[in-house]
């Protein structure tokens, strides 16, 4: 049996479908994520003011391989999960996505378990049980009914 995931872990999920696209989005959530952001993304330093913001720049994925990226910053406890949340928007190349995932994994970030963003939102008081049930119904729906 795999060890139970900790609420102290920083988690990561792709917010876009697998495959080539104009833009891809990786979403990270975790307690104190903003204080660790420069470990994950050295070229970005979110302001300590605790404000929502968008930072644009270039990220070096490999020596000589740079790409434009935007970092959306949502400080907790006012984010969707009640924790610090970062969204990284970048060109939707599967190769870039793979490089980013590997980078975050080496920094101790792990992939989410199914429903983990919703679970954290509930545990942090951002969603009530009725809202969680609505999310479950929407995710599990098979048609527009």
Could you say what each language-model-derived stretch is?
Residues 1-145:
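A glycine-rich (often HGG/GG-containing) alpha/beta subdomain
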């Amino acid at each position: 049996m795999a060890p139970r995931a900790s609420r102290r872990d920083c988690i990561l999920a792709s917010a876009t479908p697998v495959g080539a696209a104009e833009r891809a989005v990786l979403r990270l959530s975790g307690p104190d994520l903003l204080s660790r952001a420069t470990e994950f993304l050295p070229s970005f330093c979110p302001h300590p003011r605790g404000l929502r913001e968008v930072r644009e720049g270039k990220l070096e994925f490999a020596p000589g391989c740079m790409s434009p990226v935007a970092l959306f910053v949502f400080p907790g406890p006012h984010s969707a999960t009640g924790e610090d949340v970062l969204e990284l928007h970048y060109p939707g190349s599967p190769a870039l996505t793979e490089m980013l995932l590997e980078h975050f994994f080496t920094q101790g970030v792990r992939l989410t378990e199914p429903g983990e963003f919703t679970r954290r939102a509930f545990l942090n008081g951002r969603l009530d049980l009725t809202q969680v049930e609505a999310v479950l119904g929407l995710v599990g729906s098979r048609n527009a009914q």
